[in-house]
């Protein structure tokens, strides 16, 4: 079968690899759509987290963990699944024509709701990640929530907030393209951090908060989501520091991004403000299922987020496109 394998930074090649064999109870999927995740980009761009890929014979690693497909073979029986079913699932190695679902993971094969495309279903995993971040924040109606980083995770958090709460939403990014998508999805306010100081803007929008023993004026957002992280080549104030400064006393900061280097932080401000800091990693299976239900019900529309699709043979071009924040939101590979 064909697969796109990673061999080093900026080096993804398509070639022939062995088609997965099946043990008793295993399910074989014909992959129909696979998204390129931010974690894939950390590997592709800088060689970080290389062990996330699945090794292949030629020495490369097949990435891709957010995908959908069609059941084409079952060795024996798998509860609730039959050949021909349209399903979405998770695992490592989705940048390939076929994917083996081990018997113990067949419970993670969820049927794609009628009327939902393979492409939309392939965005279920990142939506579940966004949902988990929002669940950690436990938003209450009437609050102000700030999302820094309007990639697939930040925009997903916006969609979850709009679908399930009545909070005021402010989205911050440097990409006009992504901010336009945020407005399309219902963001109450968008801020281009490349043209105006996001902290100053949040202070204007939420009102200033003067903290004793602290020399800076801070914002009063109830929750701030750091969906940007810290790239290796970034030299400004870390987004996490901005988030801490934007948040009100006893507010919440949810970190749902990967840091490519350690940030320099003013921890005293975190301590003085009594902020609750959450690390948000992945999701529970119930959240994964709920994310697909949100898509299937129409409460969340993922189509505006899918900006590019590429055949498997152009996987390298797909990865390069996903790096271009001004052009792309979610890039899918269609094996």
Model feature map: region roles:
Residues 18-35, 49-93, 113:
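Glycine-rich beta-strand-centered segment in the early N-terminal region that forms part
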Residues 89-148:
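NAD(P)H dinucleotide-binding glycine-rich loop of Rossmann-like/cofactor-binding domains
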Residues 140, 188-276:
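Glycine-rich cofactor phosphate-binding loops and adjacent beta1-alpha1 units
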Residues 154-155:
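N-terminal Rossmann-fold NAD(P) dinucleotide-binding loop
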Residues 163-168, 187:
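Conserved S-adenosyl-L-methionine
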Residues 173:
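Conserved acidic E/D residue at the C-terminus of a beta-strand in Rossmann-like folds
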Residues 212, 241, 285-335:
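C-terminal hydrophobic helical "lid"/dimerization subdomain
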Residues 249-255, 265-304:
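Rossmann-fold dehydrogenase core element
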């Amino acid at each position: 079968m064909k697969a796109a394998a990673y061999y080093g930074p900026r080096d993804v090649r398509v070639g022939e690899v062995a088609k997965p064999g099946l043990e008793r109870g295993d399910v074989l999927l014909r992959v129909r759509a696979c998204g390129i995740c931010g974690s894939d980009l950390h590997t592709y761009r800088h060689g970080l987290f290389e062990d996330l890929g699945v090794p292949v014979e030629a020495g490369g690693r097949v990435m891709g963990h957010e995908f959908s497909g069609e059941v084409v073979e079952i060795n024996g029986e798998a509860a609730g699944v039959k050949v021909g079913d349209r399903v979405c699932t998770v695992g490592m190695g989705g940048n390939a024509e076929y994917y083996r679902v081990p018997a113990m993971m067949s419970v993670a094969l969820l049927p794609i709701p009628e009327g939902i495309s393979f492409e939309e279903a392939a965005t279920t995993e990142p939506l579940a990640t966004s949902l988990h971040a929002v669940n950690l924040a436990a938003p209450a109606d009437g609050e102000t929530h700030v999302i820094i980083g309007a990639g697939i995770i930040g925009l997903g958090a916006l969609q979850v907030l709009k679908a399930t709460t009545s909070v005021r939403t402010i989205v911050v990014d440097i990409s006009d393209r992504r901010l336009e998508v945020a407005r399309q999805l219902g963001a109450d306010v968008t801020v281009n951090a490349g043209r105006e100081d996001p902290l100053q803007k949040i202070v204007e929008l939420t009102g200033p908060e003067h903290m004793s023993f602290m020399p800076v004026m801070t914002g009063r957002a109830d929750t701030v989501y750091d969906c940007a992280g810290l790239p290796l080549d970034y030299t400004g104030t870390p987004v996490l520091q901005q988030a801490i400064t934007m948040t009100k006393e006893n507010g919440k900061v949810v970190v749902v991004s990967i840091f490519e280097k350690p940030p320099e932080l003013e921890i005293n401000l975190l301590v003085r403000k009594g902020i609750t800091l959450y690390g948000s990693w992945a999701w529970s299976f119930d959240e994964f299922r709920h994310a697909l239900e949100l898509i299937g019900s129409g409460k969340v529309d993922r189509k505006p987020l899918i900006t590019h699709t590429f055949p498997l043979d152009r996987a390298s071009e797909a990865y390069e496109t996903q790096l271009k924040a001004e052009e792309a939101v979610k890039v899918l590979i269609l094996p």
